Amino acid sequence: MNIGQRYGWEFTLAALLIIEILLFGIANSRMLDINILLLSTSDFICIGIVALPLTMVIVSGGIDISFGSTIGLCAISLGVMNQAGIPMAAAIPLTLLVGAICGVINAALILYTGINPLVITLGTLYLFGGSALLLSGISGATGYEGIGGFPQALTDFANLTLFGLPMPLMLFLLCVLICWLFMHRTHSGRNIFLIGQSSKVARYAAIPIARTLYLLYTLTGIASAIAAIVLVSYFGSARSDLGASFLMPAITAVVLGGANIYGGSGSIIGTALAILLIGYLQQGLQMAGVPNQVSSALAGALLIIAVVGRSISLHHHQIRDWIQRWRNQRLSS
């Protein structure tokens, strides 16, 4: 298989991204300013940080819709620890631990109950979200303001640049590299595809399904914690609703990036490109004065188009054969 066939969808997404930026640039020249393009990634790149491990979960045949609540819980946990006087050097690792525990809870419930991951993570979505609200109430934080008073070293992080790139974007690129190497260049990563294609065959092949799923859901929890820390740095406060709007864009990015929603196939690079495509779509629409409700509706339409388009691309041979048979029947009649 040559590069064009193997990465055809990724090349398509890259081309669409360039076309999108050029079209929005015609409407508003600010979209062609490289500095604005780079700095504006901080508005949506945290979604990408979570979408990367979510890609691996979906490729394995699972799903996790609780990550938005996990982000809120991790953010509030960081705020409460800061209020308690715990230094950031300890609070940040503890926040990552909170995210990891959320992932372990998801994996344990899925494995030991055998219930559909969608149902389990729907339950933990409310569990983690309720816990975040409880902690927020105990801390005395208001819903709008959240918990503030973070050290300047933390709040400055999201505004720093490295080699001309915003730190959140650099962190995202690092996550892309790590997830790509793990998923596409390690034995454990190849196991993810096998589990997603057929868990029964994977079990007969002695693939450690439980260990792999624990790892994937834990990584999603840790990524949620990382996103929470970056969001707290970006907004300067910790709120329980910080990840509330992440669900649809993240899943849309994973599916648009080439992942089969039923498992067995997917692409880290595809997800990364899809995040930029969706993020710049919303940025461009906002610059054009389009209301947020319309951009959300377009994101939903994009998800449907992605699912239908991906399905057509995967089954184009069958569709072509069906059209040929239909034509032959018409000619014979």
Curated annotation (Swiss-Prot):
GO terms for molecular function: transmembrane transporter activity. InterPro entries: ABC_transp_permease. It is a multi-pass membrane protein. Keywords: Cell inner membrane, Cell membrane, Membrane, Transmembrane, Transmembrane helix, Transport. One of its GO terms (cellular component) is plasma membrane. Its main location: membrane. It is found in: Cell inner membrane. Signal peptide: none annotated. The keyword Membrane applies. The chain crosses the membrane at residues 7-27, 45-65, 70-90, 91-111, 118-138, 162-182, 212-232, 240-260, 261-281, 288-308. Belongs to the binding-protein-dependent transport system permease family. AraH/RbsC subfamily. Part of the ABC transporter complex LsrABCD involved in autoinducer 2 (AI-2) import. Probably responsible for the translocation of the substrate across the membrane. The complex is composed of two ATP-binding proteins (LsrA), two transmembrane proteins (LsrC and LsrD) and a solute-binding protein (LsrB). This is Autoinducer 2 import system permease protein LsrD. It comes from Photorhabdus luminescens.
